[in-house]
Every structure is written in structure tokens, then in C-alpha cells.
Amino acid sequence: MSSTTRKAGKYTDFTPDEIKEYLTRFRKAILDGKYTIAKGRKRRENMEFIEDYRINTKKEREILLGIQYDDFCYAVDNQKEEFAHEKLYIFCKSQELDYWGELETVDIYIKINMTQTKSGDDYTVVVSFHRRNKPIKYLFK
């Protein structure tokens, strides 16, 4: 199954309340265990980040549940043609993490794709979960 990519639009026309509502749904999916962090071959950066900071499932959940509306940056269209109807939401969360015994504050780049299951429940794929590696602007800070 091949997928074609396309140029993604960038969206910043959100209100704080819209992002808060999105995060309410996102948190419910996390608490219900209906999420995954992408760790495949193309997501090496996610895997290295998780390994470098020894982030276990409990810590993943803590970080994800701690995302606030003012951590929101922007949304983009899914670049894969067959998922063109999906929007990915980008957040950047500052978190103190243990790097082999040294505590350091890290800006974590988090890209979220929330979709629905056939039964209508939200399911979340955290596409990106790694150290921020480029400048970013927050929408509400």
C-alpha cells in the first residue's frame, strides 16, 4: 500500500476554549488507554528520546496528561493523501526529565493525531514525541 504525500496547510485560527475541548478528549483517550506513541522505523527520534530519558509508560502518561492549552502551537493537515481529512495538533511542553542522573528541563515537541474508532471513540496516535529541534511559536503564550 503506497501513500502519496502532499503539502500540509498550517492552522492557527483556534480559541483557547477549542484547544481546551480538544485536550479534554485527548486526556480521556490517554486515561482510557486508547493511545500509542509512534515508534516505528520512521520514528527513530521518538524512540531515542524515550530511551535517552528513560521514559516509561507511567512517565509518558504523566507528560501527555500534563499538556495545557497554552502549550499549543498550531495544527497541520495530515500530509498523507489518504488521511487528508485529518488535522495533526502540535504542542511543545517544557518538562523536567532525568538524563542519566542529571535533571534537565526539556522542551518536548508533541504532534498528535486524534481519530475515531468504528464505534466512535477517540483514539490517539502521538506521531512525534521528542526534544524540540527547531524554533517554535506558541499560539497562546
Regions found by a protein language model. Give the residues of each.
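Enriched for short, Lys/Arg-rich terminal
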Residues: 107-109, 113-141
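Functional cores of ribonucleases/endoribonucleases
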Residues: 69-121
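General "foldedness" signal
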Residues: 40, 78, 105, 138-140
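Compact soluble domain cores
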Residues: 2-91
